[in-house]
Amino acid sequence: MPEPILHSKFLSGLPAGRKNGVRHGEKPEKVGEKQFDFTRKIRELRLELEIKKREEERIEKDIAIILEENTIDGGEQNRSFGLAVTRLNNHMLVVENSAKQLTSALKNISVLADTISGRVSALDVAKTRVVGCLQLAGDMRDLGVCAEGIDDAIRSEDFETASQHIHRFLTLDQAVFQIREFKQKDATDSIRHSYEVLSSAKERLSKILKSRLTESVQKGDVAEMQRFIKMFPLIHEPDEGLQRYSVFLNQKIDKLAEDNLAIMKAGGTDDNRRNVLYADTLFMFFEGVAEIIESNLPVLEHSYGLEKLLDFMFILQARIDEFFRRLHEEFDTRRRLSHFNRLVDDVIHQKKAAEAVEDAPDPMEIDAIASEICMMNTSAEMYWRFVSRRIGKNEVIRSPSGDGDDEENEEARQERHRLRKEAKEQKMDQLLNRSRVGTKMQELIGNYCLLEHFYMLKSVQKAIKSDVKEDAGGLTSSIVDDVVFIIRKSIRRAAGSGNVDSVCATINNATALIDTVVHGHLRQSIQQGYVTSSNFASEAFTAYQQGKPVKEAADAQKEQFLLALNNSAKLSELLIELQKGLITEWAGVKRPDVEKNKLEHSTTQIEESAKKLASLAKHGVEELFKSAFKNKIKQGADPYQEIDRQMTMQDVEYYEAHDPFMEQFLAQIDRLLVENEPLLFADNYQTLLLLTSSEIARQIEQSLAKCQFNRYGALQLDREYRQICAYLTNVAGWSAREKVGRLGQIVSLLNVETIDEAMEVWHNSKAMTSSATIRTLTLPEVRKVLALRADFPTVAIKSIE
């Protein structure tokens, strides 16, 4: 393209680019298919490159002009900027060189570290081999020393030294004996000879120790027995030593058993304790066994370790089980336990009537047997706790010194310790719960629970039959103290046995008796009703048919009703006290969490029974209120609706001085309450007061619904409401105010000036009412209350929303 055309394009204001170049350039000639003209294409690209260069120069000049126009020292700044960029570039070059040097140094260090690590590893291997060689050399030296001294020690009867030599021989590394197989005769003859000498000496020493220990057992020489028993673990025959030593201890246990059984068959040493003869025998036997174990345990524990002590106890337990079998058979025969169990089971499960059973068990005899079983279980529990404390304790984990292997093997040591602990717990469970003593005591505890249930049942039934009023001025009868005494005695006896399951079973049976027998007896008396003048005629006719004096029958029924009412409330209170006392007493005893949860759940059953009795007492008070109070309150409140509420100021002032209704009404209520207060338990009287408060509020509210008020009538109503509140608060406390809270809302609505004020009062009462027992007036009820105001327009009341 000619130069003038380029010049004209550059000077024009059109933007330069490939498209303009193509547009102003010559159109390319059409070429044939699969042919390209690269010469023309290259020329166009060069042209565009030239245009871009000139544009760059123009832009740089424009930038320089702008900088010169806007800054005084534009050129100086450019130079400063250029120098700064140059310095930065120089610094970056220095950093790059330093980084290359650092990289090279790190590579060298890495190579050196790998070299050092390899050498350290080689040194560790060498150290391990050297230590192994030194250990092997030491073992070989010890092997020779043991072989040289073993025969002399046996000949001189220095069995302690001989046992030490054998122990060292048996604990040597097996690598020492593998040297015997090498072909070098000079290196193996000495080792082979030492091995044969020590193996032969071990057999001879084992026979000697067994023979000597057997002789000392036959002679009863305790010192010799304890001397030889210590050597069996050293020659790796601990079970043999325990078996032979247990022969001596089993002989002592058998002698102890025979002595105690002889005393038992002779009737004991104290005639006053014949009723607990078998419990005393078991206690003395376990105490003697504990002394035998305690005196011999230190020697065995030091020589055999805790794990072997448990195996040793299994050997002794066979003789203990045999004694307990004989004791249990004698106890079952002499105390007729199986016979009583059958009779008691028939009575409790109502297979036969209690009177129909021949030779029915005497509750006092059952009481003695139950106490003796508890004492027997207490002795067994004490013995098991002794065994668990002395033998069941776990060994402390000992971590060997060192860092490397110990850290790696710490988890393995913990796992081995856990497995040993689990195995030991299984053995302890086998010893404590699966032995004859354990299983038979569990069977006896089951028998005890059955006997205890029978004793409580018969005792409670006897307490009901012999129920009498305590004294002339008393509110309760003897059944309250008798039932609580029986239940407390049985629960504490079960707790004294040391078996938590028996405690839970006893509490369960006791609460079942309260909920059925005691509750049913009290409910029956309450359901007969309270005799008043209104129902006296029907009661008198019933008494006449039965041939009883009418007045005496009515008075007796009234007294029985009040006694049942007060007995229910008092018994509920005493059961709560019993529950709290048991919780406090058991809180000081250390028990597993499982047993604590069982006892906690059982004590809640006592609370539930107390709540049922309290509910029965409340029901009785309600029946008393319906019979003796409700109609009289209604009759006293009926004249209230006859008072004209369209009052004047003079009427209000007159009523303030001469109240025509409220004083007489409250005096009538007070006479009713005063008559019944001495007859009721405190909780029952409080319930009666609250029922009276609710009924007064209900009757007054019903009377108000039949009246029409003006402003002065509402003022008089407010005064009367305050009188009611003051009286009820005085006799029943602040809880009575909640019972008349709804009436207070009605009085507040009637004492407003306008409908708007009434709505404000209603909304405030809704916001301020926090008690769930006070029901706020609904909107329809508010309309009905405001309609009682004769001076309020009906249209305005209906428009309330």
From Swiss-Prot:
UniProt gene name: cogc-4
Domain of life, source organism: Eukaryota
Name of the protein described by the UniProt record: Conserved oligomeric Golgi complex subunit 4
Biological process according to GO: Golgi organization; gonad morphogenesis; protein transport; regulation of cell migration; retrograde vesicle-mediated transport, Golgi to endoplasmic reticulum
GO cellular component: Golgi membrane; Golgi transport complex
Self-association and partners: Component of the conserved oligomeric Golgi complex which is composed of eight different subunits and is required for normal Golgi morphology and localization.
Keywords for this protein: Golgi apparatus, Membrane, Protein transport, Transport
Subcellular location, record wording: Golgi apparatus membrane
Protein family membership: Belongs to the COG4 family.
Chain residue ranges for the region called Disordered: 397-427
Disulfide bond sites: none
Main location as per UniProt: Golgi
Organism: Caenorhabditis elegans
InterPro entries: COG4, COG4_C, COG4_M, COG4_N
Matches recorded under PANTHER family: CONSERVED OLIGOMERIC GOLGI COMPLEX SUBUNIT 4 (PTHR24016:SF0)
Its biological purpose: Required for normal Golgi function.
Topology relative to the membrane: Peripheral membrane protein
Signal peptide from the UniProt entry: none
